[in-house]
Regions:
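Catalytic-domain carbohydrate-binding cleft regions of carbohydrate-active enzymes
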Residues: 1-210
Length: 210
């Protein structure tokens, strides 16, 4: 993950990478100290984003709220001391289920965002043909606290060095939202690593309008 993304960050000036889990950063520091220092420079430059806030991704249904908050506090303390930044979001792309307390927990911890793709795994639609209420919007908790939700569909999508403005799949998805905007993860799921070079090249072309 470190080496592949450091390569992409050096090769593509518009490439930005999000990575979660304080414990994984601690492992980087312990086992790959040279690459860890290179990564820290990209954090400072705003191109490697610390996501997720917590020490590690966690289930949100079984653990107590106190456990959830302590996980976030531990992660944020590590990020402040090691990287000089704090995360602003809860990032759970591969967590099964989200408790109704999540917006309240996020707000209590000073977080403003929440992102996942897991709602797309539902067997039955949420309403109509959709498996989730919206792709980008505010999720309001029972106490009135809210968090910005960005739902990215599946997390293993790859682009084959194509013109994304002509991608029929993206165009159809964008019609399903009031803002005509679609939010997507892209990259490599489960095994770590990075997006493919072709995927990054596709996004670079889109940014440049090519």
């Amino acid at each position: 993950t470190l080496n592949q993304n450091l390569f992409l960050l050096n090769q593509y000036p518009d490439y930005i990478f999000n990575f979660e889990g304080g414990v994984k950063y601690a492992w980087m520091k312990e086992y790959y100290p040279r690459e860890y220092e290179l990564m820290k420079a990209f954090v400072k430059a705003g191109r490697w984003h610390v996501s997720g806030a917590s020490w590690d991704a966690t289930d949100t249904l079984v653990p107590s709220v106190e456990s959830f908050i302590r996980n976030i506090m531990l992660g944020q303390e590590f990020y402040r001391k090691e990287l000089g930044v704090e995360s602003t979001d809860i990032f759970l792309p591969d967590c099964f289920g989200f408790g109704w307390t999540l917006p309240t927990v996020a707000a209590h911890c000073g977080l403003i965002g929440f992102s996942s793709q897991k709602l797309d795994w539902r067997n039955n639609p949420f309403y109509g043909k959709s498996k989730h209420p919206f792709t980008i919007g505010l999720w309001k908790g029972v106490d009135g606290a809210s968090v910005m939700l960005a739902h990215g569909y599946d997390y293993g999508r790859r682009w084959d060095n194509e013109d994304l403005s002509e991608n029929k799949y993206l165009m159809e998805l964008s019609k399903c939202t009031p803002l005509n905007t679609v939010y997507r993860y892209y990259g490599t799921g489960d095994v770590g690593g990075s997006p493919t070079i072709a995927s990054v090249a596709s996004v670079e072309k889109g940014i440049k309008g090519e």
